[in-house]
Every structure is written in C-alpha cells, then in structure tokens.
C-alpha cells in the first residue's frame, strides 16, 4: 500500500504542472485505473514499435501484421467492419490498409453470402505464407517476453483487459 500512496502522490505532483488539475477525489482505485490506462497506452506504443521491427524483414508493418493475424484466425474470412471491431479501429482505417494489402496480393475480397455489400476478406496464398513467416518470428518473441511471468498472472491480466474492453465497447 505504501507504493500506491507514493505513486498517487507522484501523480498528484505531476498532474497540475501538466495542466491536469482536478477537483475529483484521488481514490486509490481511481489512481490505479489511471495508472493502468497510461500503462496500456505505453504498452500499445511499444507493441507497435516491436511489431514494426519484427515485420520489417518480411516487408510488412505492425498494421498489416494485425490484419493478417485476425484474418488467419477466422474460420471463414471476416468483413472489413468485422476486422475493425476485433482490432478496435475505424472501418475506414481498416479499409485503407486492406485495399493496399489487396493490391500487394496479401488478401483478396470475396463475395459474402450473408451480405451482398460487405465482402469477405481472405488471405491469398501469399498472405498465408506471410502469416506463417510472421509466426516464425512472433512465437519466439512471445515466449521471450513471457518466460518469467506465471501463466496465472497472464490469465488474470487477460481477463481484466477483456472485461474493460467489454465495459468500454458500447
């Protein structure tokens, strides 16, 4: 609890100088949540940078990595809005990247029997090869970054993140 009090004090000391003065109470739970939010922002930036570095030799980017991964894990393809929902991005942003990926031969658009105007995104043979190449670098990276973290801690973290996503995704 002393570490929490020290962190809360540090955040209080920094916030006013950053123009973030607030009259709302600084409960420990609120401060922990805000610490979590800032940490997730930082983690996102680090994951994008790591993803770009990992995929560079494959001629890809972390944005393409995300799309390839989501489509590869779907059983029957996904629509652009479906990919956007999974990634928490706008449909327009996903449409831009999938259009470029289609031009580059990584994905193809196929008719959707469930919706005439919303086509399915599927991996081409080249896209499947890229996915397998990504797995060759992604799997050791994942192992390296989690080898000293107990599986229970990862499971608890995943449950918390999914719960917050569900709560915020309204």
Predicted regions and their residues:
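N-terminal leader segment of winged-helix/HTH proteins
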Residues: 1-58
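Base-recognition residues in the alpha-helical recognition helix of bacterial helix-turn-helix
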Residues: 38, 66-69, 95-97
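Residues within the DNA-recognition helix of helix-turn-helix
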Residues: 93, 97-100, 160
């Amino acid at each position: 609890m002393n570490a929490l009090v020290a962190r809360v004090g540090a955040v209080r000391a920094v916030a006013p100088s950053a123009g973030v003065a607030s009259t709302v109470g600084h409960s420990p739970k609120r401060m922990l949540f805000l610490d979590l939010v800032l940490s997730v922002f930082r983690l996102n930036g680090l994951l994008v940078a790591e993803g770009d570095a990992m995929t560079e030799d494959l001629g890809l980017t972390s944005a393409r990595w995300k799309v390839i991964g989501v489509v590869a894990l779907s059983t029957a393809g996904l629509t652009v809005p479906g990919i956007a929902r999974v990634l928490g991005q706008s449909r327009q942003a996903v449409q831009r990247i999938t259009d470029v990926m289609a031009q580059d031969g990584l994905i193809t658009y196929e008719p959707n029997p469930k919706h005439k105007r919303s086509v399915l995104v599927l991996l081409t043979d080249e896209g499947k090869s890229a996915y397998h190449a990504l797995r060759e670098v992604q799997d050791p990276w994942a192992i390296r970054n989690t080898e000293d973290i107990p599986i229970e801690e990862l499971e608890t973290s995943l449950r918390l993140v999914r719960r917050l996503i569900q709560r915020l995704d309204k």
